[in-house]
Amino acid sequence: MTAVNLLDFDLDALAAYCEQLGEKRFRAVQLFRWIHQRGAADFGQMSDLAKSLRSKLADVACIAPLRVLSEHRSSDGTIKWLFDVGDGNAVETVYIPEDDRATLCISSQAGCAVGCRFCSTGHQGFSRNLSTAEILAQLWYAEHSLRRERAEGVSVGARAATGPASERIISNVVMMGMGEPLQNYAAVLPALRVMLDDHGYGLSRRRVTVSTSGVVPMIDRLAADLPVALAVSLHACDDALRDVLVPLNRKYPLAELLGACQAYLASAPRDFITFEYCMLDGVNDSDEQARALLKLVGDKGPVGRLPCKFNLIPFNPFPESGLKRSGNERVQAFAQVLIDGGLVTTVRKTRGDDIDAACGQLAGEVQDRTRVQERMTRSPIRVIRSAAQPDAA
């Protein structure tokens, strides 16, 4: 019998599972805390659970972390982990400490079916959805391995001296890694519940962000089920260009997407939508296109004035993309047009340049290596550099 991975369960599902084992709900709360707040992967560590329950769980369940293929640390504090998810697939997770926050960027799929022109992951194609356990295992590993480092005197977390963010190893989670989260909704929703649960990671809805390329029906669904902060990969000011850069636009054009964003604000934890905009030299970075964006989200746009902010993202070049990063002066000029038009606009700082380039590139290299190995030797993925699994904090 295959052991049940308890990382797959939100608290309600874990309570139902405990009831199947003849246990009361409060046991699920204890177990949940041991897993997510204390990082325990061994039932024997759970000292406030009855020995009979620990023995029962050891027979039928497990807490199975992902195998770490490699860990890359940047001089700016950024950490990128590459996790093995089986069948020649790997996913990336990135930890980004800043002065006022410490953000974990996690993946929701192995590969991606959307196929955005500027995205390394999209060029790899889609392999499969991650399970809830595989999504949460990224957060679980990062939280508890870094917590152990802090206990050993290593400086991790937000660099701020005071405030709630400085007390947390991870203060923010963004689903902006590999994959389209809203095309894996069945696994993403329970993972979000665990992130927000006070018995889990206790993050506020404002500090958890789902980024989507524009799956309109699922934006509506998320608004009804669990509205967290929403970011939308926009990247173009009109349908003609967005059809090319973000092929999903052919199914859900801008007017529909902006309508869903407007409706989302009624229940969102923030009073604005974040639009992500990858700056591509000579493609979408002219002043004229910036002015078109102002019209798109302004009073005369398809849904009227849409409260939003823009995050301009420097393009990370990767082989065969055929695209170039906009120059710094062009990015600043583009941003100034938006700012002068009354939009809050930021330019994302590039982080971890000395450890990797585009999101998905490490995973793509693993895919390529694995395909060669399968043809030549039929051997499993080669471990680049193993990292120890975290102990309970």
Swiss-Prot record:
Signal peptide from the UniProt entry: none
Family matches, as HAMAP family: RNA_methyltr_RlmN (MF_01849)
Binding site for [4Fe-4S] cluster: C112, C116, C119
Species whose genome carries this gene: Leptothrix cholodnii (strain ATCC 51168 / LMG 8142 / SP-6) (Leptothrix discophora (strain SP-6))
This protein's record includes keyword Methyltransferase: yes
Protein's UniProt name: Dual-specificity RNA methyltransferase RlmN
Enzyme class: transferase
Pfam families: Radical_SAM (PF04055), RlmN_N (PF21016)
Note on cofactor: Binds 1 [4Fe-4S] cluster. The cluster is coordinated with 3 cysteines and an exchangeable S-adenosyl-L-methionine.
Gene label: rlmN
Subcellular location: Cytoplasm
One GO biological process term: tRNA methylation
Active site: E92, C359
Cysteine-cysteine disulfides: C105-C359
A GO molecular function held by the record: rRNA binding
SUPFAM superfamilies reported in the protein's UniProt record: Radical SAM enzymes
Lineage: Bacteria, Pseudomonadati, Pseudomonadota, Betaproteobacteria, Burkholderiales
Start and end residues of each Radical SAM core domain: 98-354
Further details from the record: Reaction proceeds by a ping-pong mechanism involving intermediate methylation of a conserved cysteine residue.
Family from the record: Belongs to the radical SAM superfamily. RlmN family.
Cofactor(s) it depends on: [4Fe-4S] cluster
Binding-site list for S-adenosyl-L-methionine: G179, E180, S211, S233, L234, H235, N316
